[in-house]
């Protein structure tokens, strides 16, 4: 009798229109239920049965119902799925020929029914790593989730899984590109012959892709004439050639623990373009005077040249000699002169940057030592020493010169731009500074000079607490086609060109500098190019982090549940607890709030104040050093959980 009843249809329509509907992101939990977060302000409970229709990270619309004074979200429509392409582990069930896959994500625990694509011929075993794409979703009207395996990665127990799984996840290449036919072609470019000069290369002892060499002399007026020779792969790589397209697609050499995957074929990066000792190589050279006060002279110039590095020197050897440690000595008077004058250049420039720009506080670099099977044997700290600082100052000088020449002659290039504080959050910065006894004006902090003045003041603080608190209000560095300030370095413009073997952005700037030298026209880099460079840089950094997390988990797993203690620095404070970095090896671990104090209502972990309060009293702050032991290492998610010890 209710069939085709217009009153009933009207009632249904009325109920539908009166029901609140919202759009938001699904946040899963390990307990089966979830939440729908709307604009970061409001969240609605999603009960376990309704969570079966969605995944963590899905963007959906949902109807909001009230049950016993509790607002509950009922998923209705999918706007954007969280999972599209993903990596995971294949699962097989007893007496069942079907395959399932578990996505490699800490909050995605459920198996997804899957089948291999037609072109995938691998016979999958339990635990194999695979890459898949989602094909079905309950909110699209399908009966359940289903995926299609588009590729086999590696066996589940293979020790090289961290590398191959991570590279596949981020759609990064696994091998060096093959070398196409290409010849050195300078066209009408004239090169000055500098092969008689005593250029030296300072690098790691094992480095093959050497892209810089240095030469320096002292002028009669006390200034230093510094020549920075940079390898010139653009002599071999013509714009829009096959090799150029390969370099553009990769954009950067990918440095991972244990090995690297080059942007260019190794025949170029490690041989034809590498500034090897006693080898004549095409180069682009920047020449500039360093005045006695460290300022750069007005005589900076760029030109193409032939150079021959006379000596390959190792960072540690040069540092040992400069720091008066016994052992290595320069092999000739020429090398001694070069090292001595380069050290003088470094001191002048570093002192000038401390006074007129900014110098980063040095942090240790952690390096994994691996055996041939990919096992972590040790994690060592590589400190930045005297020779590293020489090369760093020379490269910064070269990049400053390029930024100025490109700006003055063309008005464009590939620039690294960092604009300091986020303008919408500047009032919060002022408030935090005031709480800690520093008076500052918002407008001044948004200018380069004001930012630099604040940074120098923060460097004088007894701890890094205040620096860490305001760092989260800063913008991210960007790759831009126009000149712009780099607040982090304290410069009004900064453009890199010193690593063209490893960075496509530097190849672009090489071509622009050559256009200036030859007085020819060159197009401004497009926004599309800048976006490609940004995305590939981000993917490479995430890959390095992901492989590192995996290796840290393997390295620390034997210490889980033992009494071994580690010194750790608090690097972040969240509502749920502390993120810490183990001082000896650099591993990131999490300390849950329940490990800090048993009574939850008496504990407050505040990211805003950068402190942990128990009963209203601060017990921990950002950058504090605490002792911990490893409570648990969750190998499936590569998460390390630590517990404080007295």
Curated annotation (Swiss-Prot):
<dbReference type="InterPro" id="IPR012340">
    <property type="entry name" value="NA-bd_OB-fold"/>
</dbReference>
<protein>
    <recommendedName>
        <fullName>Exoribonuclease 2</fullName>
        <ecNumber>3.1.13.1</ecNumber>
    </recommendedName>
</protein>
<dbReference type="InterPro" id="IPR001900">
    <property type="entry name" value="RNase_II/R"/>
</dbReference>
<keyword id="KW-0540">Nuclease</keyword>
<comment type="similarity">
    <text>Belongs to the RNR ribonuclease family. RNase II subfamily.</text>
</comment>
<dbReference type="InterPro" id="IPR040476">
    <property type="entry name" value="CSD2"/>
</dbReference>
<dbReference type="Pfam" id="PF00773">
    <property type="entry name" value="RNB"/>
</dbReference>
<dbReference type="Pfam" id="PF17876">
    <property type="entry name" value="CSD2"/>
</dbReference>
<feature type="domain" description="RNB">
    <location>
        <begin position="191"/>
        <end position="518"/>
    </location>
</feature>
<keyword id="KW-0378">Hydrolase</keyword>
<dbReference type="Pfam" id="PF00575">
    <property type="entry name" value="S1"/>
</dbReference>
<feature type="domain" description="S1 motif">
    <location>
        <begin position="563"/>
        <end position="645"/>
    </location>
</feature>
<dbReference type="GO" id="GO:0005829">
    <property type="term" value="C:cytosol"/>
</dbReference>
<dbReference type="InterPro" id="IPR022966">
    <property type="entry name" value="RNase_II/R_CS"/>
</dbReference>
<dbReference type="InterPro" id="IPR011804">
    <property type="entry name" value="RNase_II"/>
</dbReference>
<dbReference type="InterPro" id="IPR003029">
    <property type="entry name" value="S1_domain"/>
</dbReference>
<dbReference type="GO" id="GO:0008859">
    <property type="term" value="F:exoribonuclease II activity"/>
</dbReference>
<dbReference type="InterPro" id="IPR004476">
    <property type="entry name" value="RNase_II/RNase_R"/>
</dbReference>
<dbReference type="Pfam" id="PF08206">
    <property type="entry name" value="OB_RNB"/>
</dbReference>
<dbReference type="InterPro" id="IPR011129">
    <property type="entry name" value="CSD"/>
</dbReference>
<comment type="function">
    <text>Involved in mRNA degradation. Hydrolyzes single-stranded polyribonucleotides processively in the 3' to 5' direction.</text>
</comment>
<keyword id="KW-0694">RNA-binding</keyword>
<dbReference type="InterPro" id="IPR050180">
    <property type="entry name" value="RNR_Ribonuclease"/>
</dbReference>
<dbReference type="GO" id="GO:0006402">
    <property type="term" value="P:mRNA catabolic process"/>
</dbReference>
<dbReference type="GO" id="GO:0003723">
    <property type="term" value="F:RNA binding"/>
</dbReference>
<dbReference type="InterPro" id="IPR013223">
    <property type="entry name" value="RNase_B_OB_dom"/>
</dbReference>
<keyword id="KW-0963">Cytoplasm</keyword>
<keyword id="KW-0269">Exonuclease</keyword>
